[in-house]
Amino acid sequence: MCNSVRTALAASNCCSIVLCCVLLLTLTLTVAVTAQHNQADETCETLPSEIHLIKEEYDELGRLYRTCNGDVTVNKCEGKCNSQVQPSVITATGFLKECYCCRESFLRERQLQLTHCYDPDGVRMTDHESATMEIRLKEPVDCKCFKCGEMVR
């Protein structure tokens, strides 16, 4: 009777070990397959965006000289990037996080003209020098998914 109990326990332990190995192998394969960054359904892109700009200009004494404004079309980055969290025996939290963000990969500087300029009393300026204001701004030329927190050069 003791031998049959030992045989049953040994078989039970053997099955448990095999089951654990199968589960571990399945988990490892699942993690390995999902660990690859899938770019197929990412939609990060450069899109035009209409914005309203207001720029104030002051004289050398710090007094408001003029306020200029205008509606301009500039590029923006928009879309979704794939991120994931997966179990990990290496990290302290027990999870490995891979976060990706849609952001600019290259910027360019543009010169724009604001064509509606007003003096401090709100009267539209008409003389050629004061009626318009040239400004510079940077906008994205291209956008892509970057690891969150990663600096763009």
UniProtKB/Swiss-Prot annotation:
* Keyword Signal carried by entry: yes
Q: Where in the cell is it found?
A: Secreted
The alphabetized list of GO BP terms reads: G protein-coupled receptor signaling pathway
The positions making up the signal sequence are 1-35
Keyword set, alphabetical order: Disulfide bond, Hormone, Secreted, Signal
Disulfide connectivity for this sequence is C44-C102, C68-C117, C77-C143, C81-C145, C99-C148
Q: Which InterPro entries match?
A: Bursicon_suB (IPR034441), Cystine-knot_cytokine (IPR029034)
Q: Name one GO molecular function term.
A: neuropeptide hormone activity
Superkingdom, natural source? Eukaryota
Predominant location? secreted
Q: Which GO terms describe its cellular component?
A: bursicon neuropeptide hormone complex; extracellular region
Outline the extent of the CTCK domain. 44-139
PANTHER family membership? PARTNER OF BURSICON
Assembly notes: Heterodimer of burs and pburs.
Summarize the protein's role.
Answer: Final heterodimeric neurohormone released at the end of the molting cycle, involved in the sclerotization (tanning) of the insect cuticle, melanization and wing spreading.
The entry's protein name is Partner of bursicon
Task: Please state the gene responsible for encoding this protein.
Answer: pburs
